[in-house]
Design a protein with these regions (language model features):
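Short loop/turn and low-complexity linker motifs enriched in small/turn-promoting residues
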Residues: 244-449
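Bacterial Sec signal peptide processing site at the extreme N-terminus
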Residues: 23-41
Length: 449
């Protein structure tokens, strides 16, 4: 028989811990929402200062959240034009993600029986390969084209390995699952094998460097990637009548000429956010109903369906959707759902089995405390089962692009955002000085509409 006085002290500490843990995880969720608000309003410097202060105090972003913190800092500094700083944070995140994945595979499924919010955030697979895209852009801004191409190759490789990575993780969990969970760990194949964004960047960079053969190969890969990507995003169904007529079920022709020296990228919308979905799952072996909380991706619906590029009174062209990052994220995340669901069910089973001794405690010894323990056990199962809603909040949702040639000189370029009806929504302006000694002049805009 356990020492009741000791148990009373422990149950009090448990209740206090549950309260503190619940507050901490919700506080992080709230902070992530504030980051999204700042990104929407383009208050990047303010968000950077806020993140730096929160890391110093260790009240919100703890060591287990370091990957998330570095991803946010990398993206916000990129938006703010601090490209070297941005790459420092992205490199920190890249290294930590690789270490976290190795650790998760070696530990197996039982490393995740606690609440995910208590564990190190190891990043989503799509977050891992998109960080290389923004590292590549940072290097272009720093005029380090070779380094940019290295990051593009890393991105392409990691996308190519997605199915192998997820299947390997699922097999590891399935082999270590001994709780009679009856979970189907098999992940479905991902319909993401390539990246139009990565191939488009590579084709433009090789063309600018005069590497004709490499540019041709990347152009072929780009066309293949676009053919695979457009059915995934069902782009034509998202457009209004005026835009649909010119793009119905067609992959757009992209200018990848050898003389292009201006590359324009417009990032629109925002990343899909994770929301909690609570389920009640009946387990036949344990003959009980289990509470399972799942993080579900909720897509952000952008109002922007195209971008017109103007130089003075001249329309230089239309930037049409190059890659839907949030659709790619949704596809990758959907394939990973058996793993997410399986981990949640195993947590629920472990909590259920771990609190069964309470029901067998003789009430005549201390009926009040026995009842209190039962309540505490139920409270633990309910409160501790909170979905892990951590995700890269500042990541954009879509990428639009256009490339063309300008003679040396100073120009003001207008990015005119077009809505689904084909009407102008908003305009942003960028100044550029074309220097014939510089092979690529990259201009970016970001509008989270």
């Amino acid at each position: 028989m356990p020492d009741l006085s000791l148990l009373k002290r422990r149950i009090t500490l448990l209740c206090l811990f549950l309260f503190q843990f619940s507050c901490a995880s919700y506080l992080l969720d709230e902070t992530q929402e504030q980051i999204k608000d700042a990104v929407y309003d383009q208050r990047y410097s303010e968000a950077i200062i806020s993140l730096e202060e929160s890391k110093k105090k260790k009240e919100i972003y703890k060591e287990k959240d370091s990957i998330l913190w570095n991803l946010e800092m990398g993206m916000l500094n990129h938006y703010n034009g601090a490209y070297e700083k941005s790459n420092k944070y992205f490199s920190n995140a890249e290294f930590a993600i690789e270490q976290a994945f190795t650790k998760s595979v070696s530990q197996g499924v039982y490393a995740f029986l606690g609440n995910d919010n208590q564990l190190q955030y190891d990043g989503e697979p799509y977050e891992e390969f998109y960080l290389h895209a923004f590292k590549a852009l940072n290097y272009i801004h720093l005029n380090k084209i070779d380094a940019s191409l290295v990051e593009i190759r890393k991105m392409v490789y990691k996308i190519d390995q997605l199915n192998i990575q997820l299947r390997g993780l699922a097999d590891t969990y399935a082999s270590s699952d001994t709780l009679n969970s009856s979970i189907d760990w098999d992940t479905k194949d991902i319909n993401v094998q390539n990246s139009p964004f990565a191939r488009y960047l590579a084709a433009n960079l090789f063309a600018a460097l005069g590497n004709v053969d490499a540019a041709r190969i990347e152009r072929e890969q780009f066309n293949k990637a676009m053919t695979e990507h457009y059915p995934l995003i069902n782009f034509s169904s998202q457009l209004g009548t005026s835009l649909t007529q010119s793009n119905r079920n067609e992959t757009p022709e992209w200018s990848l000429g050898p003389n292009n020296n201006v590359l324009l990228l417009s990032f629109t919308g925002m990343a899909s956010e994770k929301i909690q979905q609570d389920l009640r799952v009946y387990n036949e072996y344990w003959e009980t109903e289990l509470k399972v909380s799942l993080p579900i991706l909720n897509p952000y619906r952008s109002e922007i369906m195209g971008v017109e590029i103007w130089v003075g009174d001249s329309l230089m062209g239309h930037s049409i959707l190059l890659e839907s990052m949030h659709k790619v994220a949704q596809e990758v995340y959907t394939s990973k759902m058996p793993i997410i669901y399986g981990r949640a069910v195993l947590r629920a089973i472990s909590k259920y089995s771990g609190t069964q001794w309470v029901e067998n405690m003789p009430e005549e010894k201390d009926p009040f405390f026995a009842h209190l323990l039962e309540i505490a056990g139920d409270l633990y199962k309910e409160v501790s089962e909170k979905a892990d809603l951590r995700s890269w909040s500042s990541l954009p949702g879509n990428i639009f692009s256009h490339a063309f040639q300008l003679d040396p000189g100073s120009y003001e370029i207008e990015f005119r955002y077009i809505n689904k009806l084909g009407l102008p929504l908003y305009s942003e302006f960028r100044e550029v000085q074309i220097d014939q000694r510089q092979s690529v002049h990259l201009l970016e805009t970001h509008l989270a509409y």
